Amino acid sequence: TLVGTDKQVSEATREAIIEAQQRGKTVAIASGRSISGIRRTAAKIRLEQFGGYVIAYNGTTVINCKTGECIYNQTLDHDMIKPVYEAAEKELGLGITVYHDEEKELLAGNGVDAYIEADAKACDITIREVNDLVRAIDFPVNKLLLSGEPEKMKQVEKHLCEKFGDRLNVFRSDPYY
């Protein structure tokens, strides 16, 4: 793991990665976070300078940091957003968010909880609450993020796997997501 429990790259790790890049090694970092959420870490280990890569959204997006080119991008079928939103809101009573990297914001439907606030802070993005999340999404989406109490999220994962597992990858990235 690149970052510690404090979500920071240690100085020793930073120096080792930079040294490896100086020796000609190519570095890629992978995260479940959005591109915006990884940019500070990428800058800290100087991926842009050395031509490294960022793999965001649990592998759905790959960016060449030197050129800024997106070399791989797998988005959700837009027709899946409404059923997942309805399941989150009506069946489960959960917060659901969508990253909008171009605007450096997190769109939140069905309210904002402490977990959404923590994610926005960690990713250095703003939160924009919307009344109709499905209608507000007029851009490609890589990931829908549901949040709630850890014990409840275990059941949520099971429920959503049963409901959408044949069409979507459903998993928890943290106890509360």
Go through each PLM region and give its residues:
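Short secondary-structure boundary/capping elements
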Residues: 8-12, 54, 125
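Conserved acidic, metal-coordinating active-site core of Asp-based
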Residues: 87, 91-177
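Short alpha-helical
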Residues: 8, 36-37, 151-152
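Short beta->alpha junction loops/turns
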Residues: 6, 77, 149-150
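Short, contiguous strand/loop micro-motifs
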Residues: 3-4, 71-72, 143
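Active-site phosphate-binding/coordination module
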Residues: 13-114
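Asp-based phosphoryl-transfer active-site loop
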Residues: 1-7, 84
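Short, flexible helix/strand-to-coil boundary loops that buttress conserved ligand/catalytic motifs
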Residues: 6-7, 42, 66, 157
